[in-house]
């Protein structure tokens, strides 16, 4: 995929970006993705099942994620679950989205819209 292909997918929707972030550390099933998004956003984003799976299907169609062949041990697994993984192209797009957002945040700091440090530790 070319830089042009990556750029054509930006900006990502917040849900699509969160799904990609949830898969950076490894494969997850849909419910696991949902819970990771809720945890990481400290409950600020609680995706419903329908929109989550529609977004996942769109990301699969775009080649950003794929259904994973890896599964947990049978005693820990439910065969009905679909596991997803981030593709190399999906990682490229996620990185490009982070760079795009970092630039915008930098502009906000330059314009003194915000001052000081921004914490992601969970304290508001």
Model regions and ranges:
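Basic amphipathic alpha-helical segments that dock to polyanions
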Residues: 52-59
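Beta-hairpin "wing" of winged helix-turn-helix
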Residues: 62-77, 85
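Amphipathic alpha-helical dimerization/coiled-coil segments
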Residues: 89-124
């Amino acid at each position: 995929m070319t830089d042009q292909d990556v750029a054509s997918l930006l900006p990502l929707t917040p849900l699509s970006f969160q799904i990609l972030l949830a898969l950076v550390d490894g494969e997850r099933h849909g419910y696991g993705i949902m819970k990771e998004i809720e945890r990481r956003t400290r409950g600020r984003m609680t995706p419903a099942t329908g929109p989550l799976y529609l977004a996942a299907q769109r990301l699969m169609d775009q080649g950003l994620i794929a259904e994973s062949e890896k599964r947990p041990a049978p005693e820990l697994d439910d065969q009905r679950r679909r596991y997803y993984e981030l593709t190399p192209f999906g990682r490229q797009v996620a990185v490009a989205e982070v760079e795009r957002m970092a630039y915008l945040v930098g502009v906000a700091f330059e314009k003194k819209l915000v001052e000081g440090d921004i914490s992601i530790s969970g304290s508001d």
